[in-house]
Amino acid sequence: MRKLLRSVFSIFIAAGLLTPISASAAPNLIEVQGRVRDLQEQATTAAEGAQEAKVTLAKLNKTLVTVQQEASQQGASVTAMNKTIGAIAADQYKSGPLSKSLELLFSSDPSLYLSTAGSLEAVTRKKTADLKKFSVATQRLNATSLTVADKLSLVKAAEAKFRRQLQIANSKLDEAEALLAKLTAAERERLAKLNDDEENADQQRSLADAGKYGSVSGRGGTAIKYALAQIGDRYIFGADGLTTWDCSGLTMRAFGAAGVSLPHSSRAQYNYGKAISRKDLLPGDLVFFGKPISHVAIYLGGNRMLHAPRKGSRVKIAEFDLGRKPYIGARRL
C-alpha cells in the first residue's frame, strides 16, 4: 500500500498545496488549494482506515493459525481414539450382536451415548472411559472447527475493508491529481515556493524550540526525545522510519524506544494506555484527532505537540490544533 500511495502523494510535495496561501495568491489558486487539502484529508482518513484494517488482519491471521493448529491436533487425537473405539466395537461383536448403546455410539450424534453408557454391561469401566473421552474429544473438535470458520469469516471481512478503504483513498487522490493537472506550470511553481517557504520556517522554529522539551522523564520523556531527533524527516503514508514517517509510525517507534509496544495505526493506538482528560494533559501523552480518528501526536505541554503532520510536510513541533480535524482525546502510556 505504501508503494501504491507514495507516487500519488508525491504530487502534493511537488505542488506545495499543504500550507496556507498568502493573500496575494490568485483566487483560483486559493480555491484549488482548499479543495485539494480537503481531498487530502479525506484520503488520509480512508488510508488510516486501511491501516487499521491491516493491523486487525494481522491479529486475526495470528489467531487463525493458532486455532487451526488446535483443530489439527484435536483431529489427530480423535483419529487415534477411533482406533480404540473400533477395537471396543470389534470385541463387542465377537461377544454378540451390537447392543443398543453401541448403536447409539456410532450414530451421527455421539453425545447420545453419554446417557446410556452406564448400561453397557459387556463393556469394562476402562472401555466406558475411553468412549466418554471419544465423545468429549469429538464435541471439542466440532467446536474448534466452528471457531476456525468464524475466524476465516472475520479475516475475509478485514481484507475487504482494507481494499475498500484503499480504493477510497486512491479515488480522492485521483480527484486531487485532476485538479492539479488544470494548473499551469507557473501556478504549480508558485504554490511549491509558498509551501517550501512555510515549511522551512516551521522547521527553523521546531529546531529552535526542541531544546525546551528534552528534560521530560519517564516513558513519555523517552518517546519525546526519540521523536525530537526525527524533526525534519519527510511524511510518507505507511512509513515507520528511519528517515520517513506517518503519524502513527512515528509514535509507534518513539514509544517502542521507551519499551512500549504499539500497533501502526492511530485508531488502534487509541485503545492503549489510560484515558486522560484535556485539562490533565502532561508532556509525553498521546493526543488524537479526527472523526473517525485519523491522526496522533505527542503532547509537549504549553499547547504544543510533536508530530508527522501530513503529506508534503515534515516532522515538526506545532500548535495543539488540527483545524478541521477535531480533538478526540488523549492516552497516557
How would you name each of these model-derived features?
Residues 1-31, 154-229:
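Hydrophobic packing segments in regular secondary structure
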Residues 1-69:
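N-terminal or membrane-proximal amphipathic helix/coiled-coil initiation segments that transition from
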Residues 37-40, 51-160:
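Amphipathic alpha-helical segments with strong coiled-coil propensity
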Residues 100-103, 176-204, 283-289, 308-322:
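Short secondary-structure transition/capping segments
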Residues 136-140, 152-155, 166, 186-187, ...:
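Short, intrinsically disordered/low-complexity patches at protein termini
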Residues 207-333:
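Peptidoglycan cell-wall recognition and remodeling modules
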